Amino acid sequence: MKERKGIEMIKDVPLTGIFVNDQGAALDFYTNKLGLKKIQDEPYGESGARWITVSPAEMKIRIVLKKAEKEHEKAMVGRSDGPPVLTLGTDDVRSAYKALRERGVRFLGEPYRYPWGIGALLLDQDGSPIFLQQESNER
């Protein structure tokens, strides 16, 4: 492998996003069901959309809940034929699975053991897949 020299151009992932149909419903799901913290909620553009970001507590990364307005954006909402749109980490998938189900979160099966840890696939308010993972220390 070639050694890297100089300054790294990419140093962080501060922001990611997910397209949603209804920003209010998405904000409710991500804060009240998943327990993420609302960082921003401000008017954005002339369409009535809002700039909404949420984040796990004490994390630098923010998740934009972007209103799907264009046709290609709308086509991405609720798609479950590809990889999850987000992966969220937890220290205990089984406990999180139980607590989130009690809050009404839909899962596509029970937690499953992988070579790297345990994971479970859940669906957000629009049916977009989100992977909940717990990494193992046994690598």
Question: Whereabouts are the PLM-identified features?
Answer:
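Vicinal oxygen chelate
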Residues: K2-M9, G17-I18, I39-E42, R50, ...
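Eukaryotic phosphotyrosine signaling hubs
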Residues: V13-L15, D81-V85
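Core segments of cupin and vicinal oxygen chelate
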Residues: G17-I61
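Acidic di-acidic motifs
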Residues: D22, D92, D124
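Short amphipathic alpha-helices within nucleic acid-binding modules
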Residues: F29, R94-A99
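Short, charged/polar surface micro-motifs in flexible loops or helix N-caps
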Residues: A57-R62, E69-H72, D92-R94
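Short, charged/polar, Gly/Pro-enriched secondary-structure boundary elements
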Residues: E58-I63, D126-I130
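Short, basic, helix/turn surface patches
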Residues: V64-H72, Q134-R139
